Amino acid sequence: MGQKSNPIGMRLQINRTWDSRWYADGADYGRLLLEDLKIRKHIMKAIPQAAISKVVIERPAKLCRISVYAARPGVIIGKKGADIEKLRRALGKMTSSDVSLNIVEIRKPEIDSKLVAQGVADQLERRIAFRRAMKRAVQSALRLGAEGIRITCAGRLGGAEIARTEWYREGRVPLHTLRANVDYAEAEAHTAYGVCGIKVWIFKGEILGHDPLAQDRLMMEAQTSGVRPAR
């Protein structure tokens, strides 16, 4: 049942890979896993205005390599790199390994599911009508090259007494096709009436062949190409 399982989990080692890429056994596994959770929580809390999509953690040998994918990298780097150095020192205190921090710019945040979901959540918190927020996000994603997008909002939408679920979709979102490059994310909007949940599926085309690193490779190519999306 493609609609009831996480699209990213279904495609691991097909055209997606894990955000934590390391191997450990015994007592080290639990310790490193807890470190990863603390690192991600600290980054998200320290710089929420940087529009962070994901944090990838790799641990080759005695090194902890952290890659932060963000739409506004300048917020993380700061003036003359002061903020990124401060962040690196803070992360270094959370792990016994040497920390290497890399910032990857997301050139098209309109087709990044995490940023789209967070954008809709922010609009709901500012009391913008949920249908308008969903339609605006869908139109922006299709304009920037998405082949299909679906957004679901659930909760006391518009201050209604009874919670309900509303969704909006345009284009194709083939959840059962494993070669489909489907980006998925969730977000929460904390409104005056309670918490509303937002889910976003974005279909970006098909990836033929076995390529677990396809997502990261395409993102890095977009970063180095120097081509910015039309506004």
Swiss-Prot record:
Coiled coil: none annotated. It comes from the Bacteria. PROSITE patterns: KH_TYPE_2, RIBOSOMAL_S3. GO terms for molecular function: mRNA binding; rRNA binding; structural constituent of ribosome. Residues 39-107 form the KH type-2 domain. GO terms for biological process: translation. The keyword Metal-binding does not apply. The keyword RNA-binding applies. Keywords: Ribonucleoprotein, Ribosomal protein, RNA-binding, rRNA-binding. One of its GO terms (cellular component) is cytosolic small ribosomal subunit. Pfam families: KH_2, Ribosomal_S3_C. Binds the lower part of the 30S subunit head. Binds mRNA in the 70S ribosome, positioning it for translation. Belongs to the universal ribosomal protein uS3 family. Part of the 30S ribosomal subunit. Forms a tight complex with proteins S10 and S14. This is Small ribosomal subunit protein uS3. It comes from Rhizorhabdus wittichii (strain DSM 6014 / CCUG 31198 / JCM 15750 / NBRC 105917 / EY 4224 / RW1). The lineage of its organism: Bacteria, Pseudomonadati, Pseudomonadota, Alphaproteobacteria, Sphingomonadales.
